[in-house]
Amino acid sequence: MKTPKALAVVALVALTVPAAAQDWDCDDAGNLPQQGMNWCAYQDWQRADRALNAAWPLVVDAMNAADAFAAESFPEQANGHDSLLKAQRAWITYRDGQCTAEGARFAGGSLRPLIENFCKAALTRKRTEELLLMLEEG
């Protein structure tokens, strides 16, 4: 019966996961092995993405308020929310394509995830700044 063998493989994999998922000291990323640098770059992108996701509802609320105000006198201009959503979707496509292109120079290598995640983190931070700027200009 293959079930005990499959369970043994799953148990073996489960034992190796904690070692692979160790906490790397990202403050000293230059002295980490490639796997650690890749992990730190991914974590950096995730932090940037969480910041963007925290800013997003604030900008959406502000845009909805602007649309409500515009609808009273200029209903044809009450399209801020739709425009914001369209722009964000286009930006995600741009970010993913740009970062894949940057990483493509390192296809097949262990450096590719590092380059792609650095790129995603940088572009995501920039986009978050752009979104927050919209709150100041409103």
What positions do the PLM features span?
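Repetitive helical segments and hydrophobic/amphipathic motifs
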Residues: 11-14
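N-terminal alpha-helical modules
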Residues: 20-138
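Bacterial N-terminal signal peptides that target proteins for export
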Residues: 1-8
